[in-house]
Design a protein with these regions (language model features):
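C-terminal helical cap(s) of enzyme catalytic domains, especially alpha/beta-barrels
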Residues: 126-145
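Alpha-helix C-cap/termination motif
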Residues: 14-18, 47-51, 73-74, 107-111, ...
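Hydrophobic faces of well-ordered beta-strands that scaffold small-molecule active sites
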Residues: 22-24, 52-57, 78-82, 115-118
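Gly/Pro-rich active-site loop or hairpin
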Residues: 1, 34-38, 42, 60-112, ...
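Active-site acidic/histidine proton-transfer and metal-coordination neighborhood
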Residues: 1-53
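Intrinsically disordered, low-complexity regions of eukaryotic proteins
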Residues: 27, 120, 138-141
């Protein structure tokens, strides 16, 4: 925890000096990642917690309950990364995976937070981008009506 806290402190000081916003992202629970939920982030951040900004990536949360918990209890969320996931792959197109956006979209939309759509698209045809745009238009933002 000490090394990570010192690294966070240094990054935050550098960002402040440059007047550049910075946020820390809670990562997916895979072997190499350490900060995988809000409790670990708060513990590691320690005295930095009260002025720290966070990016919430819904694909990194183990289930919808964790997304809602983090959305409602994390202070100072700067933005939301939206993508889906399967049991074996993170950051799949929004309509392809285990994430129930029908359950999440009312809370996400009510938050008023900026939404970032996963930008990973290996082909020049922009298939993932097109799938995400279609899903957002036909399914996700439909909750607003």
């Amino acid at each position: 925890d000490g090394y990570m806290h010192a690294s966070m402190k240094e990054l935050m000081a550098d960002a402040d000096e440059r007047n550049q916003p910075i946020s820390f992202e809670i990562m997916e629970p895979v072997g190499k990642e350490f900060i995988t939920d809000r409790h670990v982030l708060e513990r590691v951040a320690g005295d930095l917690w009260e002025r720290m900004y966070v990016t919430l990536d819904v694909a990194h949360c183990r289930d919808e309950e964790m997304v809602l918990d983090h959305l409602n209890k994390l202070p100072r969320i700067r933005k939301l990364h939206l993508s889906n996931r399967t049991e074996r792959q993170y950051h799949t197109p929004l309509g392809e995976g285990v994430r129930d956006f029908g359950k999440l979209s009312p809370d996400i939309l009510a938050s008023g937070l900026p939404i970032v759509i996963e930008g990973m698209d290996l082909g020049l045809e922009r298939k993932v981008l097109k799938k995400n745009i279609t899903y957002l238009k036909e399914e996700f933002f439909d909750e607003m009506e």
